[in-house]
């Protein structure tokens, strides 16, 4: 059983590296679309982890403000990316353009929230 788990983990790690290599060499629109979706999913996962850590460290009044800010930020990010990708609406590149936008803005937000974690516990003003 343990051997099976280790083999599965190794396969997942190798497939992640293979995907990164594939993305560096993506040449078709379908490959580029897949890579952009994967990049966004990775950025979103990192953001969610950082957001949960920020919520845990925030004082109760700040937790509510952070939740409100995050909800507003998601709406703005989605609207911005819809606008940015609207020029390619119906085209094969729309998925890539939209997901690159989502990945970039999500990574920026994750970096911002990570900077809040550098503050002393309960102090989000640094």
Segments from the language model and where they lie:
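Sec-dependent N-terminal signal peptides
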Residues: 2-16
């Amino acid at each position: 059983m343990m051997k099976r788990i280790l083999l599965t983990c190794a396969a997942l790690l190798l497939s992640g590296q293979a995907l990164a290599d594939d993305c560096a060499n993506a040449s078709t629109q379908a490959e580029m679309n897949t890579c952009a979706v994967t990049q966004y999913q990775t950025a979103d996962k990192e953001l969610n982890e950082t957001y949960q850590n920020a919520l845990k460290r925030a004082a109760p009044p700040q937790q509510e403000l952070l939740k409100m800010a995050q909800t507003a930020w998601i709406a703005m990010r989605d609207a911005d990316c819809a606008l940015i990708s609207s020029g390619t609406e119906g085209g094969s590149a729309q998925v890539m353009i939209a997901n690159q936008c989502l990945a970039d803005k999500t990574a920026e937000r994750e970096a911002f929230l990570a900077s809040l974690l550098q503050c002393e516990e309960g102090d989000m003003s640094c």
